[in-house]
């Protein structure tokens, strides 16, 4: 089933112009993540950020996040792009920013990381979904990769939040849910809107 995307009609000097709501928001330098962090959503977000940087590298990009999380690899690709481009990326949590999405929320420009009052934030260690199968050697390779990814995420959260690495390691062992206020105290965001 396809998703219904509202159309916006605007008056211009040449008459009426219609476009989908997401294209209109992009004109205002708004990028949205709604749903899982996947290869497809990451590709779209990265392309939009690169486009907005090429259009004007001196203006902020406003990145709205409502996501339970998803692929760590794709989340890191978005985060790397946020760090690569010259524009400041302001992050705003609406609804939820879980797992990989909480990393994106925290990766916004310092002083420009926000959450709406009823937002929820979740951090936890990475996992493999879908059932792992294979030979012992292959499972060991996956286990080693997961351990390295966990260490990288712990270090990244520590750097982004200012929390000691030992606290991050402890908190990420299990699902750790936070309200917007708790996320602010933790250093994942700077302000509640």
Swiss-Prot record:
Protein's name according to its UniProt entry: ATP-dependent Clp protease proteolytic subunit 1
Q: Report the record's Gene Ontology biological process terms.
A: protein quality control for misfolded or incompletely synthesized proteins
**The family this protein is said to belong to:** Belongs to the peptidase S14 family.
Key word Cytoplasm present: yes
Q: Which domain of life is it from?
A: Bacteria
NCBIfam families on file: PRK00277.1, PRK12553.1
Q: What does this protein do?
A: Cleaves peptides in various proteins in a process that requires ATP hydrolysis. Has a chymotrypsin-like activity. Plays a major role in the degradation of misfolded proteins.
Any Pfam family:
CLP_protease
Write down the species. Desulfitobacterium hafniense (strain Y51)
Q: Which cell locations does it reside in?
A: Cytoplasm
């Amino acid at each position: 089933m396809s998703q219904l995307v509202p159309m916006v009609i605007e008056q211009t000097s040449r008459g009426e112009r219609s476009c989908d709501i997401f294209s209109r928001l992009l004109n205002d330098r708004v990028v949205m993540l709604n749903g899982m962090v996947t290869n497809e959503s990451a590709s779209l977000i990265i392309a939009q950020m690169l486009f907005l940087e090429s259009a004007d590298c001196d203006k902020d990009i406003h990145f709205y996040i409502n996501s339970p999380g998803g692929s760590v690899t794709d989340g890191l690709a978005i985060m790397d792009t946020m760090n690569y481009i010259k524009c400041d990326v302001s992050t705003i949590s609406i609804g939820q920013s879980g797992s990989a999405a909480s990393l994106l929320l925290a990766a916004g420009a310092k002083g420009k990381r926000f959450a709406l009052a009823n937002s929820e934030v979740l951090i936890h260690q990475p996992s493999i979904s879908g059932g792992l199968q294979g030979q012992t050697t292959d499972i060991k390779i996956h286990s080693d990769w997961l351990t390295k990814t966990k260490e990288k995420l712990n270090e990244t959260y520590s750097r982004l939040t200012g929390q000691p690495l030992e606290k991050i390691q402890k908190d990420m062992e299990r699902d750790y849910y936070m309200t917007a206020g708790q996320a602010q105290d933790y250093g994942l965001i700077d302000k509640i809107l």
